Curated annotation (Swiss-Prot):
Assembly behavior: Homodimer.
Name by which UniProt lists this protein: Thymidine phosphorylase
PANTHER family attached to this UniProt entry: THYMIDINE PHOSPHORYLASE
Enzyme class: transferase
SMART domains from the UniProt entry: PYNP_C (SM00941)
HAMAP family: Thymid_phosp
Key words of the record: Glycosyltransferase, Transferase
Native species: Burkholderia orbicola (strain MC0-3)
NCBIfam families attached to this UniProt entry: PRK05820.1, T_phosphoryl, Y_phosphoryl
GO molecular function: 1,4-alpha-oligoglucan phosphorylase activity; thymidine phosphorylase activity
Pfam family, one: Glycos_transf_3
Single GO biological process annotation from the record: pyrimidine nucleobase metabolic process
Catalytic activity as recorded in UniProt: thymidine + phosphate = 2-deoxy-alpha-D-ribose 1-phosphate + thymine
Length: 438
């Protein structure tokens, strides 16, 4: 007979946990026989005594198996089922370009994404800025879109890794969110439930990153690579910079417009392009669609230049209920804020540092993000034309523009931006890509 308290006691005392015990505990989490207090006690025991790689794999697989696990084999897809996951940040709109780009190169991308919480933006919130786009379609519509278009970006259904949802909610209120072992299991259980052959992780580093230090970001990346591969899914990770907004804008409709400009070739900001190409290329190599990174980049550039990637995005939008002319007339469909004002620099100088987290929180304060899961968001608000680290700004020139619902909100956000930028005599842009793991 399985006793949750004895299982918890073993971890409390630093003893190893076996796969059967982990599976039984997670089954209890799912069916409710393990109490909230017991989940909290387990999470705290893990926080202090950690999990070995084998234990992390066992927890991840148990959480995966707590609900539906998608199987794409019956559809006879002509390519690998692959995906990218980011630890989140500000202006991180990569998914909206990467999915269609990889699909145009022969991959199948069933991307199950989340909403934003805290200072980070969520891919689902960005897609919610597209009128009619169904971020929670039924499984048949999801599978059909992946099969016919090659990419579908949707939200997590209640039946995918339900144990993770309950465990995370308890971790969130018991000061155990920071456990790398449990972050790893949370991310990978959902990706494994999506039936992936391969995954590339984008782990952010810097002032706008989820993890507090570069060392912690690297630790998380290594854990995800080890556990993902241990669970039978080919997994690699790239550490990328989040010391400033990745795109020159932050906010839901603004970022969708940025993604459309990127796919159609109107504008491809250098930092955003570097990260998008690096992650997309690694996915093609992971999925066996390219010999090496150089070959992958060649294929991806062709997908962009030919319009094939843009066409995949347009088809995905239509398949999930959005407008057929979104790429041709984005201004017709994407909400525009009532107030748009520049934020003049208080002095001349070179941008030395940006408090990226503060920029993300400014978007939340405007109404473009949420502080509680149930909060509604305003997709029109945000920041645009943000100055980059290393860029010279003259006094009075804009550090960026605020898109707000009223003058008072605009003034508050403008003040946050001014405080978030540090100008000096010299400044050097940080690298966009740090290193690959796995």
């Amino acid at each position: 007979m399985f006793l949750p308290q004895e299982f918890i006691r073993r971890k409390r005392d630093g003893q190893p946990l076996d796969r059967d015990g982990m599976a039984a505990f997670v089954r209890g989490v799912t069916d409710g026989s393990v109490t909230e207090g017991q989940v909290a006690a387990f999470a705290m025991a893990v926080y202090f005594n950690d999990l070995s790689t084998d234990e992390r794999v066992a927890l991840t697989l148990a959480q995966r198996d707590s609900g539906d696990v998608l199987d794409w084999r019956a559809l006879g897809l002509g390519g690998p089922v692959i995906d990218k996951h980011s630890t989140g940040g500000v202006g991180d709109v990569v998914s909206l370009m990467l999915g269609p780009m990889v699909a145009a190169c022969g991959g199948y991308v069933p991307m199950i994404s989340g909403r934003g919480l805290g200072h980070t933006g969520g891919t689902l919130d960005k897609l919610s800025a597209i009128p009619g786009y169904d971020v929670m379609p039924d499984t048949d519509a999801f599978r059909r879109t992946v099969r016919e278009v090659g990419v579908a970006i949707i939200g997590q259904t209640a039946r995918l890794a339900p144990a993770d949802k309950r465990i995370y909610a308890i971790r969130d209120v018991t000061a155990t969110v920071e456990s790398v072992a449990m972050i790893t299991a949370s991310i990978l259980s959902k990706k494994l439930a999506a039936g992936l052959d391969g995954l590339v992780m984008d782990v952010k580093v810097g002032s706008g990153a989820f993890m507090p230090t570069a060392e912690k970001s690297a630790e998380l990346a290594r854990s995800i690579v080890d556990v993902g591969n241990g669970a039978g899914m080919k997994t690699t990770a790239i550490l990328t910079d989040m010391n400033q907004s990745l795109a020159p804008c932050a906010g839901n409709a603004l970022e969708v417009a940025c993604a459309i400009d990127y796919l159609t070739g109107k504008s491809r900001p250098a930092r955003l392009h570097d990260v998008t190409m690096a992650l997309s290329a690694e996915l093609l190599v992971t999925g066996g669609l390219a010999r090496d990174a150089a070959h992958a980049r060649e294929k991806l550039q062709q997908a962009l230049d030919s319009g094939a990637a843009a066409e995949r995005f347009a088809r995905m939008v239509v398949a999930l209920g959005g407008p057929a002319d979104l790429l041709d007339a984005p201004a017709r469909h994407l909400a525009r804020a009532a107030v748009i004002v520049p934020v003049p620099a208080p002095a001349s100088g070179v941008v030395q540092r940006v408090d990226c987290r503060a920029l993300g929180l400014a978007v939340v304060a405007l109404g473009g993000g949420r502080t509680r899961a149930e909060d509604a968001i305003d997709v029109s608000v945000g920041l645009s034309a943000l100055a980059e680290i290393g860029q010279r700004i003259e006094s009075g020139e804009p550090l960026g523009f605020v898109h707000a619902r009223d003058e008072a909100a605009a003034a508050h956000a403008a003040d946050a931006i001014r405080r978030g930028y540090v100008l000096g005599d010299t400044g050097e842009a940080p690298p966009t890509l740090y290193r690959q793991i796995g």
